[in-house]
Amino acid sequence: MTTLTAQQIACVYAWLAQLFSRELDDEQLTQIASAQMAEWFSLLKSEPPLTAAVNELENRIAALTVRDDARLELAADFCGLFLMTDKQAALPYASAYKQDEQEIKRLLVEAGMETSGNFNEPADHLAIYLELLSHLHFSLGEGTVPARRIDSLRQKTLTALWQWLPEFAARCHQYDSFGFYAALSQLLLVLVECDHQNR
């Protein structure tokens, strides 16, 4: 990626981590349909690889604004996709895709981070990977840790995530009939792919 700054990419990862970690509340629902978010989406669409994914997400958000009981329905979608059995779901854990759940713990230790006691999910949850990537991108912009060290850790994290993210996104597309989380997972997939190629 060329036009987005490290801080902007960090913000996208942090935002996606939040949306994949718990159901949206009324405030978040209002915020994603706001003019401020529309400006943010315009910025993201200035990156050609992200354009189609952002357009689809905006379409799903527009559909949300006219969906009856939008918050409750979206909460049901979240629950069905991410909290049920893996039969017809897209579980957001590396271990659900036969990946090493200890890898993220090693990466967190290397980054000097640990999981929050407020987040009652296993460490191999998708949101933890995204928070780590957000932290690393913010660190790149700060210049306090050598960029080579941060970049090496970023690449390791992206590689570990890429081992299972495509299957997770495919399952979101398969089982999310409304399509909000399918669109969100597609944006994440493209973002991670671009980030991974930007060595």
From Swiss-Prot:
Q: Is Cytoplasm set as a keyword in this record?
A: yes
Q: Which cysteines are joined by disulfide bonds?
A: none
Extract the InterPro entries matched here: Chaperone_TorD, DMSO/NO3_reduct_chaperone, HscB_C_sf, TorD-like_sf, TorD/DmsD_chaperones
The chain's coiled-coil residues are: none
Q: Which GO terms describe its biological process?
A: protein complex oligomerization; protein folding
Q: This protein's superkingdom?
A: Bacteria
Q: Where found in the cell?
A: Cytoplasm
The reply on keyword Transmembrane helix is: no
Q: Name one GO cellular component term.
A: cytoplasm
Q: Which UniProt keywords apply?
A: Chaperone, Cytoplasm
Query: Where this protein primarily resides, as one coarse class?
Result: cytoplasm
* Similarity comment: Belongs to the TorD/DmsD family. TorD subfamily.
Q: What does this protein do?
A: Involved in the biogenesis of TorA. Acts on TorA before the insertion of the molybdenum cofactor and, as a result, probably favors a conformation of the apoenzyme that is competent for acquiring the cofactor.
NCBIfam families attached here? PRK04976.1 (NF003442)
What is the name attached to this protein's record? Answer: Chaperone protein TorD
Q: Which organism is it from?
A: Escherichia coli O17:K52:H18 (strain UMN026 / ExPEC)
The opening ranks of the lineage are:
Bacteria, Pseudomonadati, Pseudomonadota, Gammaproteobacteria, Enterobacterales
